[in-house]
Amino acid sequence: MTKFIFVTGGVVSGLGKGITSASIGLLMKARGYKTTNIKIDPYINYDAGTMNPYQHGEVFVLDDGGEVDLDLGNYERFLDTSLTFDHNITTGKVYSTVIEKERRGEYLGATVQVIPHITDEIKRRIREIARNYDIVVVEIGGTVGDIESMPFLEAARQMQLEEGRENVAFVHVTYVPKLRVVGEQKTKPTQHSVKELRSLGIQPDAIVARSEDPLEEGARKKISLFTNVPEEAVISAYDVEDTYEVPLLLEREGLGKYLVKRLGLEDREPDLREWEKMVAKYKALQDSVEIAIVGKYVKLTDSYLSIKEALKHASVSNEVKVKIRWIEAEDIEEHGTKLLEGVDGIIVPGGFGARGAEGKIMTIRYARENDIPFLGICFGFQLTVVEFARNVLGMKGAHSTEIDPQTPYPVVDLMPEQRNLDKLGGTMRLGAYPVKIKKGTLAYELYKKDLVYERHRHRWEVNPDYIEAFEKAGLVFSGIAGDDERRMEILELPDKRYFIATQFHPEFKSRPMKPAPVFHGLVKAAKEYKQEKDATH
């Protein structure tokens, strides 16, 4: 019998429900239970693919090409697993299916309503995934009281009724503010939030109280009394230095043990040794390197969440802390490359459109000419080709046709299969594709194999007509698409310390104990470069 743990949020959004859900998943998996995580996003978009990163943070891409909420990235990293597009349930998907069924006449003339038709479809989607697992953690996005999340909370309430109380638990994440004026933690927002949840027919089994400092005993007692939750199940989730500490904190607070007991499961000793080792290693790092990320969404660093995490993973494997210098690409256009002075490594990440493109090209030139360890990703890969064409091959005005359709040298062009599309949603080259790696190259040294699967999200590619000219000038295409030999995937400059760019997004497959090879290589090169600089000064 599958067990379900629903995670809801109250008071304010952005409390870390995603990290809490991922941590619960990890604590169950560490006990030997086959566990997975589902994210419910109550917005009406079908998926996260066409959303602005400023509003929503990064769009995370799965193996099957699903463009999903960044929380699924956290689930994959914490549980070291690969999820599917079905693990992200949105209002858009649910309504689409119900309307299609209604058009096909599957409801036999019934009046189609939120209850039972929408709620049944939500439950069907959750159960569909649950079939292969012992425990399913379901995070319901948004805040209790939001009009959008009502049908999902109702479906969760019904599931507890249908599956039996012993098979469904509710964890409510709330915020306990501390008012500086009075210097005490305030539990009233939590009380009201739980009251709201109970008015919808849901009694939480555990409360994860987010606060800056550990929860005071008085506050814990008060929350327990007013929310009808046992004291042992009022969990203090105070701020920690790093999100990877959260599972260990929740375990120390007794959440794993409590949930297993609440669901009538055998409480096995959780095996968190590897995780503890990784966290201890990360916290103990003394030396640091500084890596610049030059992008167009740096005002909201969550737009590059997986890159931040991949650098963290690589910092553990290289035993050196990575400090990130965030630089707006347009600032480079305005103030020049002096903004990059002193960095030990440079990343130009993905991103669409003309804004900041010239700043990124200036950055790539600076990295190449000054031999600074460099990694270009997706659009960063394409602009590396543009920079090389302009400044090494002398192709004045070379560009990507995405930015300049009239360029005399279209060194980056729309992929042939992308030419006549009228829809933007879900139509790119998305998901995991095979990449063949040439032996004797930096890429082969990093991956140590000649065939890898990496995740993609792009419409443009290196124009095959120019490949020969690039190669003659010393640019090495060390990775090509396994499904189309004319499609370039990895480029490198062998005469540089570390200069590599990928058409795919290596950050999406990076894991705490298995850093993405190109990130590991970048941090290693940055560390060596810094040591060289320090030795000469």
From Swiss-Prot:
Q: Which residues bind CTP?
A: 13, 146-148, 186-191, 222
> Which positions does UniProt annotate for UTP binding?
13, 186-191, 222
- Gene Ontology BP terms: 'de novo' CTP biosynthetic process; pyrimidine nucleobase biosynthetic process
Q: Which residues bind Mg(2+)?
A: 71, 139
Q: Which EC number(s) are documented for this chain?
A: 6.3.4.2
**Residue ranges constituting the Glutamine amidotransferase type-1 domain according to the UniProt record:** 290-532
Instruction: Tell me the pathway.
Output: Pyrimidine metabolism; CTP biosynthesis via de novo pathway; CTP from UDP: step 2/2
Subunit comment for this entry? Homotetramer.
Which HAMAP family has this protein been placed in? PyrG
Question: What is this protein called in UniProt?
Answer: CTP synthase
The species this protein belongs to is Pyrococcus abyssi (strain GE5 / Orsay)
